């Protein structure tokens, strides 16, 4: 299974070619795709991929592996949100995926042991490793006109106690102190929850002072100096806020929740507390512009 991002297309293609050279009968599934049309396009443009999956993949991927292992590939159309090949033709699911994994389930906790065993085997220094965590999925706002990040994803939050336990356990188990969050908005329109989450991160950092949060994304609306200071104390070094434009008029037109003033104040407080603001993109040439 290959998680497909824009920056990984070439790497995924090369990996797929090598796998097919070694084992032509191997089934390669590509995921992390936003729409049905994009999934079809991947199969049209990359011959080494056999199946493309769009939207959330945990449950469909489980059903897919069951069908393949039981040699029931003629039943693939019953699995939601996949495109696949049959006799040179690209077909798609008859049904949408309606099954979404419980983010707080321990069954979803990743095990990176084999990855770090390989790092040790090849002598790769652990300082280059970065652990990824998820405290929620999709976005509570879902209104920004240009955003494609949440297509096929259902918004829901993870129990913060589960996330904090996962972080503490992973840091202890793997000895990795650089982490990042994959959430589109760590605050999730719930400042009390975010405050409690920061408290938990600070407790972990007391035990592991080297803990560094190298990426986290938030919506700047409603964030004040106290919150930014607490983020710094919790270990945040880099944050993304979805800046997009210095024009309030344009931000309103594209339905951003951020405002020029909320972005400016966050950048001011972040500078004060030594948090780097990453990915402060300025969008140009929008239809609304």
Regions found by a protein language model. Give the residues of each.
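Glycine-rich beta-alpha loop elements in corrinoid/cobalamin-binding modules
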Residues: 1-97
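Short beta-alpha connecting loops at secondary-structure transitions
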Residues: 251, 281-282
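Conserved ATP/PPi-binding loop(s) of AMP-dependent carboxylate-activating enzymes
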Residues: 96-114
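Catalytic cores of alpha/beta
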Residues: 39-45, 226-228, 286-289
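Radical SAM [4Fe-4S] cluster-binding motif and immediate context
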Residues: 108-276
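Short, intrinsically disordered, charge-balanced linker/junction segments flanking boundaries
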Residues: 3-14, 91, 264-274, 279, ...
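Short, solvent-exposed loop/turn segments at secondary-structure junctions
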Residues: 1, 34-36, 58-60, 97-100, ...
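Structural beta-sheet core signal
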Residues: 30, 215, 279-281
């Amino acid at each position: 299974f290959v998680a497909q991002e824009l920056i990984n297309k070439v790497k995924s293609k090369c990996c797929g070619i090598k796998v097919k050279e070694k084992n032509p009968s191997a089934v390669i599934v590509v995921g992390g795709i936003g729409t049905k049309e994009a999934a079809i396009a991947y199969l049209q443009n990359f011959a080494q991929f056999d199946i493309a999956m769009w939207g959330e993949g945990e449950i469909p991927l489980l059903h897919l592996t069951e069908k393949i292992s039981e040699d029931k590939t003629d039943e693939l159309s019953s699995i939601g949100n996949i495109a696949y090949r049959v006799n040179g033709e690209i077909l798609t699911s008859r049904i949408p995926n309606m099954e979404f994994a419980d983010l707080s389930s321990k069954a979803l906790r990743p095990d990176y042991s084999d990855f770090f065993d390989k790092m040790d085997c090849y002598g790769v220094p652990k300082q280059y490793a970065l652990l990824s965590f998820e405290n929620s999925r999709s976005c509570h706002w879902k209104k920004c006109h240009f955003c494609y990040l949440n297509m096929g994803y259902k918004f829901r939050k993870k129990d913060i106690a589960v996330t904090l336990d996962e972080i503490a356990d992973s840091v202890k188990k793997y000895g990795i102190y650089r982490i990042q969050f994959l959430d589109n908005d760590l605050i999730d329109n719930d400042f009390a929850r975010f405050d409690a989450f920061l408290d938990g991160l600070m407790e972990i950092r007391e035990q592991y002072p080297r803990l560094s949060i190298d990426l986290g994304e938030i919506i700047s609306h409603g964030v004040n100096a106290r919150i930014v200071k607490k983020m710094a104390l919790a270990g945040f070094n880099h944050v993304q806020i979805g800046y997009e434009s210095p024009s309030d008029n344009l931000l309103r037109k594209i339905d951003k929740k951020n405002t020029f003033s909320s972005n400016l104040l966050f950048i001011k407080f972040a500078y004060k507390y030594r948090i780097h603001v990453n990915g402060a993109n300025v969008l140009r040439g929008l239809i609304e512009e």
